[in-house]
Curated annotation (Swiss-Prot):
Pathway: Protein modification; protein ubiquitination. It comes from Danio rerio (Zebrafish). It comes from the Eukaryota. Transmembrane segments: none annotated. SUPFAM superfamilies: DPP6 N-terminal domain-like, WD40 repeat-like. This is Activating molecule in BECN1-regulated autophagy protein 1A. The gene is ambra1a. Residues 716-725, 1091-1103 have a biased composition (Acidic residues). Substrate-recognition component of a DCX (DDB1-CUL4-X-box) E3 ubiquitin-protein ligase complex involved in cell cycle control and autophagy. The DCX(AMBRA1) complex specifically mediates the polyubiquitination of target proteins. Acts as an upstream master regulator of the transition from G1 to S cell phase: ambra1a specifically recognizes and binds phosphorylated cyclin-D (ccnd1, ccnd2 and ccnd3), leading to cyclin-D ubiquitination by the DCX(AMBRA1) complex and subsequent degradation.
Length: 1315
């Protein structure tokens, strides 16, 4: 048999012959899975002991016969899948088990972890092993390795590896900080790869700040987007603080013996940090040993920046999570350039983990002490390499240049370089699992934190870590390469290098090295402005001056700091970045390297380094069409020639508070800008009486400044005025006039952000997204409301916390380097609540997970994304579907062709309902098709009685492990439900009949289903549609379909044994005022109530009758040409009839009338949707024949002729029919059966049935489309083929409109007598 045969008969036949085709078994499984999705599903609740209040996770045994479930009563129940019976109870946890897993190979072995930090491995045949974490922290996830005796335990920011034959785990790996909690660990089915989910550090410090993806496509626009960063105190905490941490590393001292000092003032506030030493990480350590050797924070250190860093690092030793976040975004774009997407390589710039759980250190081996780099001579080798490539082993100084030994031990980690050789040319450090240091001797391990020259100095002992290379890689991977320039001689080379690092606006800027030069003892800290230049060319808006402060981030040729040499060659060699050369007009200013400068608080957005001038803002020069910088210089050297025309221009005023303006219409944008301008002008006028203030001298050596000439120089001084706003003091050039905003600014302000990152105009704007701060605040409120309602899973989806999924190669049992957030990132942002929030297919080729949507809302939408785990397209999103925040569980079918999404109750979003959809099943049909890549197949509905009103949420939903077996789910009410497919043709019924909900009997009796009459006419196409309507209407009248009763033959009339349902059971609605309101009852079901009426159940003194209508085949000939729009001659009888019916009801005479839509007058009877009055009872004694005739005369049959003959005929036919059925009562006499049969075939009423458009021939087949044809989309040609005798003899087959009750029927929709 050829490959790809999908015919099950051929496959089975070939298997019988002993020649099965390739993958034939899998094809059969796929066919089974496809077939079962179209079957009816039946739910079975598992009877659990103790009736737990909630069911959390589900797991299946490797032999697929057992299912384990965790519950809120701290127990674990084992259930047989086939029988649905609970067979085991595992008791022993002190708190709720949060994670659960079976061993994929060993039968009867199950592991569970609870919220108090206890891990238990249960043997269902008896016995268990347990281990308790030291801090009693909750166990987040567990994973058995398929082939090794190894259990992975995720708790807090650690992953423990436990061989349960030992008392405790033998090793542990940790993330870079305590806030990077590990939420999920999962092996692929073969155990070759390990999946980890770790909290993204960017979510922890400040949820209000945006997370800027560093994608290769977006990198050229990154600098433009930096225009839109937030206020001075909170701008870009991720990359900003990361670069600040980088600049806090000190290099070896200069040739003059100068010592290094702390470079980051924010890292000097070591008060709140009492954690262990993290010097091996290359971070600023706050332990007691390192703090004693650090210079205290200077008295004028700005507390705002320290507080901002402290706010981001209050739970860990230093803000080292930012570099991980920064590097994480670029890994996907770099992956395509590597030899393989994810090999067993790890970034050399990552933090390593502690291999020993008993270590007294912080638990993260992290970066072992990286030695300082020696100075390179002017003509250093490798001049063609990129800047920063010198931090290699070959660049180590003499005291720490020894190479590290190769790894030792079975559990050691093999590290390969992830940087391309032409980019970095460095060797990856190799770690051993036997110690927390590199392969060097213990004696040099600690001394390498500081060179001998720095041992006695009160300076920072920070080292140049591999993270510095990550910064270099970050720029170089996207900006390309250039040849480096020849470095200068002496210490100016180091100074120039430091300035180039700080001014790293242009990644192509060449430089001799990447290590940081030390500072002088008189001026220990560099300014924040100087450090912020590496913050991807940020332009920060100053609220006070209403201008964009460039934050001292000059380009390669702009003003040079004391480290900048005076050589003119340097200015001409370094080019300007292509993305910025149209923005700035650079003004190089030379200065001497020994000029001290007082420290200025960072909140003033001034340069507090050793610069001789400060950047006040940027102005737009209309003459040159460029942005020009405005500097503040020292008082004694104000010779900088600043363009007066530039000062008179206005900069864009896109503050974070006004982010919503970008999506407004130009008119609204201009109006908002005008309001801001007027408010700002009034604020300036309030301070206009203040005397002009001169800036303080910035340097004690003002003669060192020699500004470069600038065109349009009209003044040698710049006057500044100080003012206060929002509690802060600001300075602005006095001659920089304010101008009213113009509409022309609107176009210019929109170019700095990509559309997907543009915030909305506001909540109520149809085009925009909410501001980041507003969006985060509202989501926090919603999450708090939801979690207060007990839906922590939904709150987790609403919250701003995201997780990164990393895919680790475990074929060689290499420990995952989870401390490095930039390597092996499979999904950078996703939502994880528990183990049910992520699933790997049985074949290990697909990964399903929820990711946040780019479109913000209240709350955010989520996206179900299915990624590929195949080697050729690893990490590629194949399928996606949008969901609300209540999608909390996902499971891939055994064959990987369907996905089930478990839903929590949306009680805060939707009204309460009795029918709860708890899950949806989708078919994966077309990759890369967006929303159409998945097609919904069916919904999983929780079985609940209509009188029960409670919210039901899914905690976990899983497919049963074998194809076609079904699915199972656990709810927040403690239910464990197994759904199995049932063949819809097993009982001879159709799919649509089974898809309808069966209704509960509200009374003592029931009737047979009208679908049983489908056998009266072979090939009837209305059976399915009619039965759906029957069930709906019978539920309204309190009836339920039951098996059909035996039919009887009486006087040649074939009909079923009929019963009369007491009318009192059908009166549960009020009478509406509008007589023309159409009925919502699906009338064909009332037919069943009529055709099975039991007249013998009525009391003897009661008079009841069935008044049928004649079929359309006996309609009078003259009615054939009647106009439907022509008013009836008896239209006046309509109102009279309605009033008569209401009067009878008011007097208690009439108790029930069952009807259908406005267009029809009678409830449907029979399999053809015939329209017949069911019954009504008169309580005031027996009904005489005259009364019956009188009642029929009250509403004459509408039509061109008089209604009296038709009324008599109808009454006469009632007599014959009731006599046939054995009805006890008197009826009208005088018309024989033949005449009755002829008159029985009446006509449709155009006046009272506006849906009817044509008449019906009384002698031949019908050519018109009746009410049922309009409602059901079918003609009556099938009905016309029947002889009139059959129609007249069987009222259940009469599709006629009874005009006697035409009006009354339409007037009783929804009343107590209808339905």
């Amino acid at each position: 048999m050829k490959l790809g045969q999908r015919n099950s008969v051929c496959i089975l036949s070939s298997r019988e012959r002993g020649a099965p085709g390739l993958a034939s078994y899998r094809v059969l499984q796929q066919l089974v899975e496809e077939k079962t999705q179209r079957m009816k599903w039946q739910s079975q609740k598992v009877e659990l002991p103790d009736s737990p209040r909630s069911t959390f996770l589900l797991a299946f045994s490797p032999d697929r016969s057992l299912m384990a479930s965790t519950h809120v009563n701290h127990n674990i129940y084992i259930t047989e899948v086939k029988s649905g019976k609970c067979v085991h109870s595992l008791v022993g946890h002190r708190r709720t088990p949060w994670c659960l897993t079976f061993h994929p190979i060993i039968p009867g072995l199950i592991a569970s972890g609870c919220l108090d930090g206890e891990v238990r491995i249960w043997d269902l045949h008896g016995g268990s092993e347990s281990w308790l974490t030291e801090s009693n922290s909750a166990i987040a996830s567990l994973a058995f390795h398929p082939t090794a005796q190894l259990l992975l335990i995720a708790t807090n920011n650690e992953v423990h590896l436990w061989d349960w034959s030992r008392k405790e785990p033998f090793t542990v790996v940790k993330t870079a900080s305590e806030t990077e909690r590990v939420r999920l660990v999962r092996f692929d089915p073969l155990g070759h790869y390990l999946l980890t989910a770790i909290v993204n550090p960017s979510n922890q410090p400040n949820d209000d700040d945006p997370e800027i993806p560093m994608d290769s496509v977006e990198m050229p626009h990154l600098r433009q987007r930096s225009f839109l960063q937030s206020q001075p105190a909170r701008r870009t905490p991720i990359l900003h603080n990361f670069l600040h941490i980088l600049t806090s590393r000190n290099s070896v001292p200069q040739a003059g013996g100068a010592h290094s000092a702390s470079t980051d003032g924010s890292s000097d506030s070591s008060g709140p940090y009492t954690l262990m030493c993290v010097q091996p990480l290359g971070m600023v350590c706050f332990c007691s040993r390192c703090s004693a050797a650090r210079v205290p924070s200077p008295p004028d250190e700005d507390p705002s920046d320290s507080a901002s860093l402290e706010a981001q690092a209050h739970t860990f030793s230093s803000a080292r999570t930012e570099p991980l976040q920064m590097s994480r975004f670029s890994v996907e774009s770099r992956a395509a350039n590597r030899s393989s997407a994810f090999s067993s390589v790890y970034g050399g710039g990552s933090n390593m983990r502690n291999h020993s759980s008993s270590s007294g250190r912080r638990g993260v081996t992290g970066m072992a002490p990286v030695p300082h780099f020696r100075q390179h001579p002017p003509g250093r080798e490798g001049g063609g390499r990129h800047p920063g490539a010198d931090w290699t082993v070959s660049g180590l100084n003499g005291q720490s240049s020894s190479m590290t030994p190769q790894r030792t031990g079975a559990s050691s980690v093999s590290l390969l370089s992830v940087l391309r050789q032409q980019e970095t040319s460095f060797q990856s450090p190799v770690y051993t699992s036997a110690s927390d240091r590199w392969g060097s001797t213990p004696g040099t391990s600690s001394s390498r934190h500081r060179p001998p020259e720095e041992e006695g100095q009160s300076s920072s002992s920070s080292i140049h870590s591999v993270l510095r290379c990550n910064l270099y890689r970050y720029f170089m991977d996207y900006e390309g390469t250039q040849d480096t320039v020849q470095p200068l001689d002496g210490s100016r080379q180091d100074q120039q290098t430091q300035e180039m690092l700080n001014n790293n606006m242009d990644p192509e800027q060449p430089g001799p090295s990447h290590y940081q030069s030390p500072y002088s003892g008189e001026n220990p800290p560099h300014s924040h402005m100087n450090r912020c230049r590496v913050c991807h060319n940020l332009f920060t808006y100053n609220q006070g001056s209403r201008r964009w402060d460039r934050t001292g981030q000059p380009s390669s040729t702009e003003r040079n700091t004391p480290w900048q040499p005076s050589s003119s060659a340097f200015h001409s060699v370094a080019p300007v970045s292509q993305s910025n050369e149209h923005l700035l007009e650079h003004r190089p200013i030379e200065s001497t390297p020994n000029t001290p400068e007082p420290h200025v608080p960072f909140s003033q957005r001034t340069d507090t380094g050793q610069h001789e001038e400060q950047a006040v803002g940027l102005v737009f020069n209309q003459e040159t069409g460029q942005l020009e910088r405005v500097y503040r210089q020292s008082a004694s050297s104000r010779s900088a020639n600043i363009s007066q025309g530039a000062l008179n221009q206005e900069m864009p005023e896109d503050t974070p508070d006004n982010d919503y303006l970008r999506r407004l219409s130009p008119a609204a944008y201009y109006a908002q800008r005008m309001i801001q301008y007027l408010s700002r002008r009034d604020s300036v006028r309030q301070h206009s009486h203040r005397p002009p203030s001169r800036p303080r001298p910035l340097s004690s050596n003002p003669s060192s400044l020699s500004p470069s000439p600038v065109p349009n120089a009209e003044s040698s001084e710049v006057d500044f005025e100080e003012f206060e706003e929002n509690g802060s003091r600001y300075r602005t050039p006095r001659n920089a006039r304010m101008s009213a905003p113009s509409l022309g600014r609107f176009v210019g302000t929109r170019r700095f952000l990509l559309p997907e990152f543009l915030p909305y105009a506001g909540i109520f704007h149809e085009r925009g997204q909410p501001g980041l701060a507003t969006h985060s605040s509202v989501n926090r409120v919603l999450a708090g409301a939801v979690i207060g309602d007990g839906q922590s899973a939904v709150a987790s989806n609403i919250a701003n916390t995201t997780y990164r999924l990393q895919w680790w190669d475990f074929t060689k049992f290499d420990l995952p380097e989870i401390s490095n957030a930039s390597v092996n990132v499979l999904v950078p942002n996703c939502k994880i609540y528990n183990d049910a929030s992520c699933d790997i297919s049985a074949d290990g080729q697909l990964l399903a997970v929820f990711i946040p949507s780019s479109q913000r809302g209240f709350p955010d939408e989520g996206i179900l994304a299915v990624y590929s785990l195949a080697p050729h397209n690893l990490g590629e999103m194949l399928y996606s579907k949008r969901f609300g925040p209540n999608a909390i569980s996902v499971s891939l079918s055994p064959m990987g062709r369907y996905v089930m999404v478990g839903l929590a109750s949306r009680r805060i979003l939707l009204h309460q309902i009795s029918d709860h959809m708890v899950a949806q099943v989708f078919r994966l049909q077309q990759p890369h098709a967006g929303e159409t890549s998945m097609r919904r197949v069916f919904d999983v509905v929780y079985p609940m009685a209509p009188d029960q009103r409670r919210h039901v949420s899914i905690n976990s939903a899983r497919w049963l492990p074998d194809p076609g077996l079904g699915l199972a789910y656990g709810t927040n009410k403690g239910d464990l439900v197994i759904c199995r497919p049932v063949d819809v043709h097993s009982d001879g019924s159709s799919t649509s009949e089974h898809s309808e909900r069966m209704f509960t009997i509200n009374n003592g009796g029931g009737v047979g289903p009208s679908s049983s009459r489908s056998g009266d006419r072979a090939g009837s196409s209305r059976t399915d549609r009619r039965s759906r309507r029957d069930i709906g209407l019978m539920n309204g009248v309190g009836l339920q379909p039951q098996p059909p009763a035996a039919s009887v033959t009486s006087q040649g009339t074939q009909t079923q044994n009929q019963r009369l349902q007491h009318a009192e059971t059908q009166t549960d609605r009020d009478l509406p005022d509008d007589p023309q309101q159409p009925s919502t009852s699906q009338g064909s079901q009332v037919t069943d109530a009529t055709e099975s009426l039991d007249f013998e159940t009525l009391p003897e003194d009661s008079g009841s009758e069935v008044v049928p209508e004649t079929p359309p085949h006996s309609r009078p000939q003259e009615d054939e040409g009647s106009d439907p729009s022509e008013p009836s001659t008896d239209s006046t009888g309509q109102a009279e009839y309605v009033s008569r019916i209401r009067r009878l009801m008011a007097e208690g005479g009439m108790t029930a009338v069952v009807q259908r839509e406005q267009s029809t007058t009678m409830a449907s009877m029979g399999s053809f949707g015939n329209n017949i009055i069911v019954s009504h009872r008169i309580h005031r004694g027996s009904q005489t024949g005259a009364d019956a005739q009188n009642r029929t005369r009250l509403s004459p049959i509408p039509g061109p002729s008089s209604g009296a003959p038709e009324s008599l005929a109808a009454a006469s036919y009632s007599r014959v029919l009731t006599n046939t059925l054995g009805f006890r009562g008197d009826t009208a006499q005088g018309i024989d059966l033949t005449e009755q049969e002829r008159l029985h075939t009446s006509f449709f009423t155009p006046e009272f049935s506006p849906l009817f458009s044509s008449a019906v021939d009384a002698t031949g087949p019908s050519s018109s489309i009746g009410a049922d044809s309009v409602l059901e989309g079918e003609d009556f040609h099938d009905f016309a083929s029947l002889p009139p005798s059959l129609l007249s003899s069987s009222p259940s087959l009469s599709p006629v409109n009874n005009s006697n009750y035409s009006n009354s029927d339409s007037s009783y929709l929804g009343d107590e007598y209808g339905r």
